[in-house]
Design a protein with these regions (language model features):
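Universal eukaryotic N-terminal targeting presequences
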Residues: 1-3
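Extended, low-polarity segments enriched in aliphatic/aromatic residues
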Residues: 6, 14-309
């Protein structure tokens, strides 16, 4: 049992928690720079190589809920990481490379690390093995220049996907502008993100995510922060105010298990989670982890390690 904001969550009762599961998700209710470095250490492995990328969302101005640079600074500098992101495909202040660099500066990310827009020079294709919707995934052209990726995600709702977590961060988040269009339309359009069907879209996210993990041969780790739990994504510059308290930080080597654990925690919270649950259910958000498990991206069952116990 953990208590956050006066609300109690029974960790042992999380729907997909299984002590015999092969995937482990680490959890702490503390949200602090120290907790970020501690949960990374708890993983028992590190992203390795000379060049490490830290993937996150830079956040759409003026008031999105992107991760606070002060929260992640120590961890980013510990791994000597370069913060990376890709341009958006739907307009806004991050659809243009020069403007995106300015947003990263304005939001404080360039104060803590180097920053690179991965698709400022276009796309590179990654093969999608075993995909039902995609045969290729177009990521930023500079994606292959990094040996390992540390993926820092802010878990929250999303207007189109229903939720945004680790899988979204490595699929839509690492997709070039052209790649984002392919994912949104399940491979039908290279130049427009609009008009796709919902389940093929979320299946494409899982398939694009798997292509990223496959290309890195597992040299990728995931940390998700469950704070500012709005129904809206950080691509929304004016998100709805959260109805619920912050939950904590989770980490795993398995993005499917990590996203599933975040969903389970939302459902298990005794807080007012109705708006976020409605957003997820109205978009069939859970389908991204269902498909992710089916294609071998990860497992929905996980063993939860409570670092506060």
């Amino acid at each position: 049992m953990v208590t956050n904001g006066g609300e109690t969550i029974a960790l042992s009762a999380l729907e997909h928690q299984n002590d015999g599961a092969s995937s482990t998700v680490y959890y702490t209710k503390e949200i602090s720079p120290e907790a970020m470095t501690s949960i990374y250490a708890a993983l028992g492995q590190e992203v390795t190589g000379e060049k490490i990328a830290v993937k996150l969302s830079t956040g759409e101005p003026p008031a999105s809920n992107y991760l606070d640079p002060n929260l992640i600074k120590d961890l980013v500098q510990q791994v000597n990481g370069t913060i990376v992101e890709c341009n958006t495909a739907y307009g806004g202040q991050r659809a243009n490379t020069a403007m995106h660099y300015q947003v990263a500066k304005d939001h404080g990310f360039t104060d803590i690390a180097d920053f690179v827009v991965l698709d400022e020079d276009g796309s590179v294709s990654l093969p999608v093995n075993g995909g039902e919707q995609l045969t290729e995934n177009l990521v930023g052209a500079h994606f292959p220049e990094y040996d390992g990726y540390l993926v820092l995600s802010h878990f929250k709702g999303h207007a189109m996907a229903g939720m945004g977590g680790a899988i979204k961060n490595i699929s839509i988040g690492l997709g070039s502008q052209e790649g984002k269009c392919l994912i949104h339309t399940a491979g039908k359009s290279h130049d427009s993100p609009w008009g796709g069907e919902q389940d093929p879209f979320t299946e494409s996210m899982a398939e694009a995510g798997k292509s990223v993990v496959d290309s890195l041969d597992g040299n990728i780790l995931f940390i998700s922060v469950m704070n500012h739990l709005s129904v809206d994504c950080d691509c929304n510059g004016n998100p709805a105010q959260p109805d619920m308290h912050d939950i904590g930080i989770l980490a795993s080597a398995d993005p499917v298990a990590l996203d599933q654990a975040c969903v389970d925690l939302v459902y298990a919270s005794q807080d007012d989670t109705a708006s976020l649950i409605q957003r997820m259910e109205s978009r069939n958000a859970i389908h991204v982890v269902e498909h992710g498990e089916r294609i071998g991206l990860g497992s929905r069952s996980y063993r939860l390690e409570n670092l506060d116990a």
